[in-house]
Amino acid sequence: MGLFSSINTASTGLTAQRLRLDVIANNIANVETTRTSEGGSYRRQRVIFAPRVVSPYWK
C-alpha cells in the first residue's frame, strides 16, 4: 500500500465520520420537532455504510 492510497483511505474514513456526525447533529437539532413541512412527524435519520470495492487502476 503506497502513501497516496493510505491518504485516500484515511480521507474516506474521515468523510464517512463527518457524514455520521452531521446526521447525529441533525437528529439532535430536531429532537423536539413535532411536524415536518410535509405534515408528518420527524423521523430520525440513519447512516448506513457499505464496503466500497475498488479494482486497481492498472487492471
UniProtKB/Swiss-Prot annotation:
Pfam families: Flg_bb_rod
UniProt keywords, alphabetically: Bacterial flagellum
Subcellular location as annotated: Bacterial flagellum basal body
One cellular component term from this protein's GO annotations in UniProt: bacterial-type flagellum basal body
Family: Belongs to the flagella basal body rod proteins family.
Subunit structure: The basal body constitutes a major portion of the flagellar organelle and consists of four rings (L,P,S, and M) mounted on a central rod. The rod consists of about 26 subunits of FlgG in the distal portion, and FlgB, FlgC and FlgF are thought to build up the proximal portion of the rod with about 6 subunits each.
Protein's name in the database: Flagellar basal-body rod protein FlgC
Higher taxonomy: Bacteria, Pseudomonadati, Spirochaetota, Spirochaetia, Spirochaetales
Gene name of this polypeptide: flgC
